[in-house]
Amino acid sequence: MLSDINISRKHVCKPIAEIATNLGIVESELSVHGANKAKISLSVTNRLASKPDAKLVIVTAVTPTPYGEGKTVTTVGLTQAMNAIGVKTCACIRQPSMGPVFGIKGGAAGGGYAQVVPMEELNLHLTGDIHAVSSAHNLAAAAIDARLFHETRLGAIAFTKESGLNAVNIDPENILWRRVVDHNERSLRQIEVGFGAVNGPVHSSGFDITKASELMAILALSRDVKDLRQRVGRLVLALDLVGKPITAEDIGVAGAMTVIMRDAIEPTLMQTLSGDPCFIHAGPFANIAHGNSSIIADSIASKLADVVVTEAGFGSDMGFEKFSNIKVRESGYKPSAAVVVVTLRALKANSGIESEVAIDQPDMARLEAGFANLQWHINNVHQYGAPVVVAINRFPTDTSAELDWLQAKVATTNAFGCAISDAFANGAQGAAELAKVVHAATMVESEFNCLYETTDTLESKLMTLAEVGYGAASVSLSDKAKLQLAWLHKQGYSELPVCIAKTPMSISHDPNVKGVPRNFELPINELRLNAGAGFITALVGKVMTMPGLGIKPGYLNIDIDADDEIIGLA
């Protein structure tokens, strides 16, 4: 079988204007960027405001493993197959970060014959949204440091007299806004800035990867430009000398930041190998942010299609939980069905059993032990109220006996249905059975619900997520987190939803604990306010907001060949 990039390159894409027209987008709503992608105006939703919303399908997965579960493959393959059986369907996915592309994970266009094309355009730059987020974010960092410099240099009274602005009295020990770059760069995690006689004061800072920026979460959760502008204005950049928040509005940078992001608020339209529409927009990580594509992309797609298929990052304890308790709460757009992706390899890897048998070889002992992880994720998704469909993403080495066993086991759970998907190898045809089961699930009456009310106390929300969301026995707060909790209450932020930042490699906070962890204590190390995005992030265990490159990063394989073609992109 050809590599993903060769499959993409051999494919002849339809003109993107044709994809848009077939979807129902008119010419005035289309801004073409080259031959294969286009920005779509938010005016679509106004034109089609009276049209009922499409059914929404959310794709999640079991606890992730190094082998890959194929969530994007399933999202794209399901979209292809739904259209093939006559159900007008559009996909909505996140924009990939170049950090993982050049690191270890690779791109995020799907794979095989279930991918968004051209994959190299999707994985590298796209229409520049991530760069816009980086620029807007770093403008705020420059603005807060410049304000600190001038207020310190002149003093509050002279500063106000010379500038006409009120002094905000920034505490240099409490500058919360770091910088961002869209690469994995561990050496920038902790830095000191302001050295030199005319560059200070010196203070601690650091870099996060752009997808960890609160601006990325804001982009994903905003409804329109007005909402974006208001959210940017609420960003807390620092604290003043008496511990009160200083916002982007306070230092006058919110308007300029919004201007930089004005075009980024429009989703980008591309196509699958079958010529099906796919919106790509925003890209917050699911382990450190809320891990879902934008509300705007969903809302536009919901007026143009009959079914919208989107995905949430990592396992159901991560992106799906945040989809349910943060994104749905903001958008009001509830799913009609949820798909849990699983592979035989994932069950074996999540079994917690060490074995000399290769992961792609039959091993019933590990399969049986690992099934508990799938059972947990089915139950986890089911408690939110949407019908659950299990998609078994098939690999070439999977045996019929193993697949039959797994289907029989799923039949004993409270899943609505189960189907094997071979979309990677066979595109729409490979996901035909899955499409039928998912379509049937969307026809079932269901009542979707969140796990908690925002009016619950912060302590109660943390406890609910720990116990009901992860199966923890208790929660512990560090001394730092306790002080932050009291501050959040005092400043009036206690009614915001909670976003747990933790490892995706286990349901618990410990990546080494596989299967279904039980009776553990969830350690909350830090609470971070995201006033613009509208949630409080609780850092659990060891969480990095800036990845590092491994010993053999992906960029070693990437180059330009003699024909000026990109090679080695995965």
From Swiss-Prot:
Pathway: One-carbon metabolism; tetrahydrofolate interconversion
Record-listed E.C. numbers: 6.3.4.3
Annotated keywords: ATP-binding, Ligase, Nucleotide-binding, One-carbon metabolism
A GO term for molecular function: formate-tetrahydrofolate ligase activity
InterPro entries reported for this sequence: Formate_THF_ligase (IPR000559), Formate_THF_ligase_CS (IPR020628), P-loop_NTPase (IPR027417)
Binding site for ATP: 65-72
GO biological process annotation, one example: tetrahydrofolate interconversion
Catalyses which reaction(s): (6S)-5,6,7,8-tetrahydrofolate + formate + ATP = (6R)-10-formyltetrahydrofolate + ADP + phosphate
PROSITE patterns cross-referenced by the UniProt entry: FTHFS_1, FTHFS_2
Name of the protein described by the UniProt record: Formate--tetrahydrofolate ligase
Family per similarity comment: Belongs to the formate--tetrahydrofolate ligase family.
Classification via Pfam families: FTHFS
